[in-house]
Design a protein with these regions (language model features):
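Short coil/turn linking the two alpha-helices of tandem helical-hairpin repeats
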Residues: 106-107, 165-169, 234, 238, ...
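A cross-kingdom marker for long, charged
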Residues: 297-300, 322, 335-342, 350-408
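Bacterial N-terminal signal peptides
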Residues: 9-20
């Protein structure tokens, strides 16, 4: 009997063990930069202390500012809290997931835990065809307005929880962040649900669907494509099938961006078909959701650069926005015709993050606009305000990959 045949059983055991460990503790290679660029320092000459002070000010106002005009974070009882969409008088999985991400990036464990407990207590579906999903829209008392899911909420929940698992040590009675994240990763791939409910990720297209229902799973939202997140899930998912799936999703989403971007303006639509074609009507325009695609492309480039396309694309869309002059409307047809007479700090914020991939000369005006903009207040402070703070973190070098200890 050959030595190879004698060693085969032992090798198989070693491979199985190493495969199981990959999901819990991926090797450090390929995990992106150990620190992210601070564009405010690079391009605006701001000191690190100035950048931190601006971020601290945004945190303080949005989490502990005036109840009526400033804050978004509202504590409930002894151990819960929610992020409020003030203008629509509701709580959304989008906002809760952004609040969690801001908290983990700023090392705010108490606020993170309060938010997550509210999510699990009020948004989570623990049975039925939606098991493992979260209601995207609730009243302030936690009752559901719409029990359905918006796919980006689950995506950002999973990523924030994984970062929390790697940043904070487990203590007796604490939230098991890693288990919560894995449950969401599993749920998003589960298409065996029955009735009208589907997987959040289309099993064949390997794209996040607009919503996991029979109708809304026939198309996607380009801003739900987060290849930088999928790259990390491909390392940290505890299942081999999951790791393979997320690796494929990262490749698909990068290719999808190339199909969905207008060749001249770089703009992408609010909703689109799986082949990148925009939906008909106003949802085929560059609108509120689509602002976020600018940052999605740039963050992926910052963490996992693959080719030169992300720079070309970021240059294209920032150049188009700058061509509008001093007043930059916040919505357009994909070929560049304005369909709005409003400006929004949320668009400037996402364009500033585009500087992680774009030519510095194109990025600098948007970084300056973001730096000079006041923290959003008033009725419509929710969406603009959260994008404002996320952009400060991403452009300011504070939006980090928090990896398992053994991968650092």
């Amino acid at each position: 009997m050959s030595i190879l045949r004698l060693l085969a059983p032992a090798c198989a055991l070693l491979l199985a063990a190493s495969s199981a460990l990959v999901g819990a503790c991926s090797p450090g290679g390929g995990l992106g930069p150990t620190s992210q660029r601070n564009l405010f320092t690079e391009l605006l000459g701001k000191s690190d202390a100035e950048v931190q002070a601006k971020i601290d000010s945004a945190w303080q106002q949005q989490f502990y500012g005036d109840d009526a005009t400033q804050r978004l974070y509202y504590p409930v009882g002894d151990d819960q809290a929610y992020i409020a969409d003030i203008g629509n008088a509701d709580v959304r999985s989008e906002g809760m997931s952004y609040g969690l991400m801001i908290a983990v990036q700023l090392d705010k464990r108490a606020e993170f835990d309060r938010l997550w407990r509210w999510v699990k207590a009020h948004m989570y579906h623990d049975d039925g065809p939606r098991r493992g999903y979260f209601a995207w829209q609730c009243h302030f008392d936690g009752t559901h307005i719409d029990p359905g899911s918006a796919s980006d909420g689950e995506e950002w929940f999973a990523m924030a929880l994984l970062f929390a698992a790697h940043r904070w040590s487990a203590t007796p009675g604490s939230i098991d962040y890693a288990a919560e994240a894995q449950a969401i990763l599993d749920a998003m791939r589960n298409d065996d649900r029955g009735g009208e409910i589907t997987a959040i990720f289309h099993p064949i297209e390997k794209q996040a669907v607009f919503a996991p229902t029979k109708h809304a799973s026939r198309f996607t939202d380009p801003s739900y494509h987060l290849p930088a997140f999928y790259e990390l899930w491909a390392r940290w998912d505890r299942t081999e099938a999951g790791r393979r799936f997320w690796a494929d999703c990262a490749i698909v989403s990068r290719d999808y961006f190339k199909k969905a971007a207008h060749p001249k303006t770089g703009l992408m639509s609010e909703y689109a078909h799986f082949d990148g074609r925009p939906l008909d009507g106003e949802k085929g325009d560059f609108r509120y959701d689509a602002w976020r695609v600018i940052s999605n492309v740039a963050l992926d480039h910052a963490w996992f650069p693959t080719d030169g396309w992300a720079t070309e694309q970021s240059d294209r869309v920032l150049r188009f926005l700058l061509s509008q002059g001093d007043f930059i409307p916040d919505r357009y047809t994909l070929d560049g015709r304005p369909v709005s007479t409003d400006e929004s700090v949320g668009l400037f914020a996402m364009a500033a993050v585009g500087g992680l991939a774009a030519d510095p000369k194109l990025a600098k005006p948007f970084l300056q606009r973001l730096w000079d903009a006041p923290i959003p207040t008033g009725r419509w402070r929710y969406y603009n305000g959260l994008l404002y703070t996320l952009a400060l973190l991403e452009a300011g070098g504070r939006f980090q990959i928090h990896a398992p200890a053994c991968a650092r």
